């Protein structure tokens, strides 16, 4: 992984009055570009092949310029060009997934956030070590041969809802498992899914204070999954099973949510614990992150995963959410990222938020 010292040397040669935001044209890039534009920062879209035509339909979010590469593996080749343009890279799920964790970790361009989190987020065992070390309640790990109730089986690195299936017993597990893929088997939690969108700032001082910096809860969403969200219109689970139809969990979109106000203290406590643990483990998780949770009918909150960067569910709120509007009107996660970068440049603290 490229060192903080190397990144600091690159930043020292940047014109801090002419910074640019760069990201891959996918996932949440429209929101990122829109937020940067609203904060007066230049924008650079990295795209494979021709620039996306549909960006022309959204002129306020269209990047100021494009850099075209033939494949994601070619992105390191444009590092010097990005540096010449005073670019700061904003990672999102597609960026890291398609480029590859190792290549992204070595990219010689200042990047918003702490790249050390990649090691802890991409490995489900280390992710569990982090979250349980923070005192977070997670679904229990189950021995496949001892499955007595429904379990969720997840392949490591599964993205966008792919690589998941539910098994009711060991026979069903054996029927669907790919033994060559690393996987996790955990209890299936019955409840309502909430994806909680947080933002951790080590340099702001006003707000929900932590041991260092502040925590913000900007929004929340629930994912729309195909075909799980509509499949039971066709019949009962038993009827579907008899017909050879099985639920899948591919994310196709997102819907907005708010939580009961009485749950907000617990929601903030979850975010606080995760950030405080990250400070001790790897120097802190900077910027946006999402806790993927299930709220049970006993009002327990179980965390089943963390995404340590901007998530696509925040795209619902390019003009603000019911929560972020109470921080600042029309505040999106993309805009909040741009604000943090501007504040870091103004206060001489970019080293704290870039890696």
From Swiss-Prot:
Q: What are the binding positions for 5-amino-1-(5-phospho-beta-D-ribosyl)imidazole-4-carboxamide in this chain?
A: 27, 94, 254
Q: In which pathway does it act?
A: Purine metabolism; IMP biosynthesis via de novo pathway; 5-formamido-1-(5-phospho-D-ribosyl)imidazole-4-carboxamide from 5-amino-1-(5-phospho-D-ribosyl)imidazole-4-carboxamide (formate route): step 1/1
Q: Which InterPro entries match?
A: ATP-grasp, ATP_grasp_subdomain_1, IMP_biosynth_PurP, IMP_biosynth_PurP_C, IMP_biosynth_PurP_N, PreATP-grasp_dom_sf
Species for this entry: Methanococcoides burtonii (strain DSM 6242 / NBRC 107633 / OCM 468 / ACE-M)
Under what name is this protein listed? 5-formaminoimidazole-4-carboxamide-1-(beta)-D-ribofuranosyl 5'-monophosphate synthetase
Q: Which UniProt keywords apply?
A: ATP-binding, Ligase, Magnesium, Manganese, Metal-binding, Nucleotide-binding, Purine biosynthesis
Set out the biological process GO terms recorded for this chain's protein: 'de novo' IMP biosynthetic process
Report the sequence similarity comment from the record.
Answer: Belongs to the phosphohexose mutase family.
Residues covered by the ATP-grasp domain: 101-332
Q: Name one Pfam family in it.
A: DUF1297
